[in-house]
Amino acid sequence: MTKKEQALIEQYAKSLVEVASEHHSLDALQADVLAILETFVTTNLDQSLSSLAVPHAEKIKLLTLLKGNNSVYMNNFLNLILQNEREAYLYQMLQAVLNEIAIVSNQYDVTVTSSLPLTEEQKSRVRAVVAKKFAVTAGRLIEKVDPSLIGGFIISVNNKVIDTSIRRQLQAFKMNLK
């Protein structure tokens, strides 16, 4: 992706988030974006929209199906994408919208990787640690289970990581022995 395309994607995302923020609709926008991104993942819609082999009329039909129960701002955004024939960039734009929402609201997704599933009490403690250590509000808590950690956990928020896993400690110990 070129810098020009990246700038275009970011501009569309910022504009949509600004409009939703002005009308206090960030939560609704975030829900819409997550639902549409889920559709992209389950149907490989991104390939169809970015393919030159798919006629523009078909792309219009596909995006019209996405409009469904979305907010007015999301539907207007999808109409704008169709008018400007930018549907090939829609998936990246929606991801950029989530990033912009996180920046504006200081609310980031938290990924927790542990050797066992977390209890509700542990999840609330993770949210407290994130608020204290990273000075952000925890958005969605994405839980991953990786038995190779042996014990402990890895918390990732906004490109920052806390790794207290036994696996990492063993690796560090191994490096110290060399």
Curated annotation (Swiss-Prot):
The keyword Transferase does not apply. One of its GO terms (molecular function) is proton-transporting ATP synthase activity, rotational mechanism. GO terms for cellular component: plasma membrane; proton-transporting ATP synthase complex. Disulfide bonds: none annotated. It is a peripheral membrane protein. Keywords: ATP synthesis, Cell membrane, CF(1), Hydrogen ion transport, Ion transport, Membrane, Transport. The keyword GTP-binding does not apply. It is found in: Cell membrane. SUPFAM superfamilies: N-terminal domain of the delta subunit of the F1F0-ATP synthase. InterPro entries: ATP_synth_OSCP/delta_N_sf, ATPase_OSCP/dsu. F-type ATPases have 2 components, F(1) - the catalytic core - and F(0) - the membrane proton channel. F(1) has five subunits: alpha(3), beta(3), gamma(1), delta(1), epsilon(1). F(0) has three main subunits: a(1), b(2) and c(10-14). The alpha and beta chains form an alternating ring which encloses part of the gamma chain. F(1) is attached to F(0) by a central stalk formed by the gamma and epsilon chains, while a peripheral stalk is formed by the delta and b chains. F(1)F(0) ATP synthase produces ATP from ADP in the presence of a proton or sodium gradient. F-type ATPases consist of two structural domains, F(1) containing the extramembraneous catalytic core and F(0) containing the membrane proton channel, linked together by a central stalk and a peripheral stalk. During catalysis, ATP synthesis in the catalytic domain of F(1) is coupled via a rotary mechanism of the central stalk subunits to proton translocation. Belongs to the ATPase delta chain family. This is ATP synthase subunit delta. It comes from Streptococcus pyogenes serotype M49 (strain NZ131). The gene is atpH.
